[in-house]
Amino acid sequence: MLFTSISFLYYFLPIVLILYFITPKKYRNYILLIFSIIFYMYGEPKYVILMLVEIIVAYFGALLIDKYKSKEIFLITIIIHIGLLCVFKYTDLFIGTINSIFKTNISFLNIALPIGISFYTFQILSYVIDVYRGKVKVQKNILKLATYVSLFPQLIAGPIVRYETICGELDNRDETIEKFSLGVRRFIIGLAKKVLIANMLGELCTKFSLVDERSVLFYWIFAISYMLQVYFDFSAYSDMAIGLGKMFGFTFLENFNYPFISKSITEFWRRWHISLSSWFKDYVYIPLGGSRKGTLKLVRNILIVWFLTGIWHGAAYNFILWGLFIGVFLVIEKLWLSKYISKLPKVLRNIYVLFIIMISFIMFNAGSINEAFFNIKGLFGLNKEVFINNYTIYYLKSYLIVLIIAIFGATPLFKNIIEKLKKSKCLNKIINILEPIFLVILLLLVTAYLIDSSYNPFLYFRF
């Protein structure tokens, strides 16, 4: 089930909210658990069993780890979860690699990827690791652990919520009118970002893939549009997840912090998909030694993390290329580039970041490595195409307003303007009156679009 579907917005969510708030507090987790499983079953009925098996393994594994302080039990539990992720996500990549290297003809298994497996597996792993480290207390109520893992606001596309951040809220959380209203506001803003901006940018990117007569300018428009589409698509889902969490009394950590204003690649990845970046930092990079054990190990650790980050996003070589490309730039910045770019004007540093990230997302989007390099060459006119043509002019005119809104919306500009206006008591009152009206208008526009549109999944569902 999609957050951006009529069935979710006007049937599932209202029913869950009504039943949740009329239920006594001590039973509300059960309502969330039941409806989270129904939510998942709507799209993946057979893979509910897989998720429940992983929850059971994590529950008993953590209990045994806590009781016996056993490294062996810890490793077995971790291997089971990583093993299941690898089987369902990487089997065909492995078979394809074997076929390419050894010229064999092993048939692909074509295993369907369970929605959200990368996200909920990482949540389970963080819980088990933190229990082993003594960072969190083991959860002795399997239903509470199941609620944590399967909580529908963040189940299928994050953010990756750590057990330590919401364990207290599983037992006791504040559900206030203020928190609920903030949740509704955040959810509607995320909904509008997805439907009115990300989907429109996605249409433009689709047009690019269908046009035979491309131009150099069209390659640039596509590259910028796709980069913005990924941002608005995924940050929109995070907004909706955080908003839904607030409605039910949970506080999820922020997942994006205006990454496109960054002045270095390092800063960009502190601001983009924060829950994933911090996960790899805490559970892979630091345990490997981080930056403490010499230059060679620093390089090794960064490249390992970014190889894993790339392959986490998808079982294809373009994702590995994307991850290693980012990793190499992070290494270069760490070793020497940062001291030079820090002397440049802020605008030039920002342009440098945007260019590198744009190139990386061309790799991220490509169906193959050859396609990635072909599209990168197109940016520089190396595919023997004209600089501009009629197709480019037509599509630029058609999507110019959306592009402008997206470019400025990816910065704190609108937020800063509103905050400055709110410093005036008079304007603050006007904004407080107009904001609910604006949100209702957004919801109506989104609803009209959804009624008239087809399937519009989030990009990160495939991860």
What is each of the regions a protein language model found here?
Residues 1-462:
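Membrane-embedded transmembrane alpha-helical bundles that form the catalytic cores
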